[in-house]
């Protein structure tokens, strides 16, 4: 039987190829990576495309503090597909990876590594430990990115801790300060008691917390306008009713705010009178479970109560009744507990009343101070319960409702934060907000809803708090007059600090005294003195990464400003997209990017967020080990990444089947090109059969569709076009019906089919090259070559229809 089979086989032209059916990507990919590294693939590609128009995709720097995850993989692979495609589309598209290397997470890990010694080490020693930690993770993450097939200048990444970067960042700060956009002032800011530092809006995440919402009554003490007497209400039995969800802020209460446009009623309960917004009386009474009450007299405009006085609920002080437009009728009582030291609206309205003090009875660790009286020393969260218990016992609490609400948390430690008024450095967004709007309009946003999202965020944001009370970062380059305390920033001081940092790095700020840094001859503009101290704060890390348009795009010779594209996840609208936009508009008057492309989050197969505790996470290393990096790349291309992208073992298993069909299409063609020399064996178009011309027309359609997909970064469209072409047009039809010609003859019909298949495979391989970077190169290595074809498929030009 075997003999007969052998005799039969000899009469057929059966496919022959060493291109394996089983991909074996986990073993093959590292071999290819070594070849790319040995042959300096990235730099050779840049040299190959020298002189062509540039396409600059500027890399947003990931934080250098751990292994990559599926979200990072999604991000880097999208970028790599774009870079590879652009380099095949007639551009020189360099890719300079970057790393964000300063900030609290690294500092906390550094402190943890020294244990009990952390109290004994100097700031300079701590910074050196931080730098070592960051640089170690840069190498780890770079290797993980390269394992995904990402090509770029990983030998020379940009790092926010490099002296030349820090120097340029200081210059950006100086340019903004010179224009009046930087100032220092007392304002309530997001404050993390656990990290003991101020936070920016971009560093806040919201989570659901339980809390007690309470209605508290404050006893009226003075009625200078005679409002109560006018309406026959006894002052000694009258109270303002406020509502709050932050009981711990009551020690800081200095005012009660009403809205002058609302009407307020006197609500009699027993023989006592309670002032609250007329429209909210019923809801307050219901919440307090009070059934027997009476509204006395006619409603009174809120304006009539202005500058009345009341006694604090337990401290020996009086507060003021003031007016503010931020008071609404959506909840509460229409009388807002106002603590200017612990809320932005509170602070702003208190600024209109100089007689109202700003009190901050909370220290940087979240503990109440002596200003809180008997509660001094209690953490604010614990104080909630003790203050509530005491006020309930004293009769000050009218009602209490246990609720769940969205509350801000620190995105670093994930613990609840507080608002706390402190002296901080700010960037005054209000001064150049209109310029930012104009810059937003010049940018192409993908998806286009990004335009309105960014505009809305800029419209709604307060001034940017750019100072942090930590050690690992770029210092605020400000000096203070020892005599009068006025801060001092001039062109000369900025240049001195920038030059020093460029030479020695920002560690120099901690090595030298102020007099050793500040230029000779500088005098205080206020008092004329010339003795100085240095600022002790560092800049927000978003100011670091927000300076890359200057420190990287303008400084690296292979790049340019503005970038053609910034591409990151949707969270960067409040992060890197925005900080870059603000610093660029403030310093240069324009956006740092021509276009912004945004992707969604990676979620599990059910659409839920991935959490280690839930056991629903998938690590890139696991998928690479089981399937290879090309399957992760195919997952990226097959997804609509503009929304949340699902990932899971079942999804990757299905994708491996789709990959196998694409691979087997290539393998079948390679097998039938055995012995085919495209330099001598290709036939003219007029010698092709009708079915061959149909196949080439289908190829033209594929090129049109994939070209359109790549042009708008719709890789999902590219993937589906390729998959359908391989499965439907090729495997199910053309390759099937041409088997007789291929297997049974050696004449013109076979040559025509081989010519057609060769053209198809060359084009198909180039089309999939940006996505399946490993498999496309493997196919390319096995493919018969014509003169002028490059060793690496990524050096080729993307095929065009016609």
Residue ranges of each PLM-predicted region?
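Residue patterns forming the tRNA-binding/recognition surfaces of aminoacyl-tRNA synthetases
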Residues: 2-25, 31, 35-39, 111-251, ...
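N-terminal catalytic cores of NTP/NDP-binding nucleotidyl/phosphoryl-transfer enzymes
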Residues: 47-109, 169, 242-251, 257, ...
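Substrate-binding beta-hairpin/strand module that engages nucleic acids
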Residues: 359-368, 592-599, 603-604, 644-654, ...
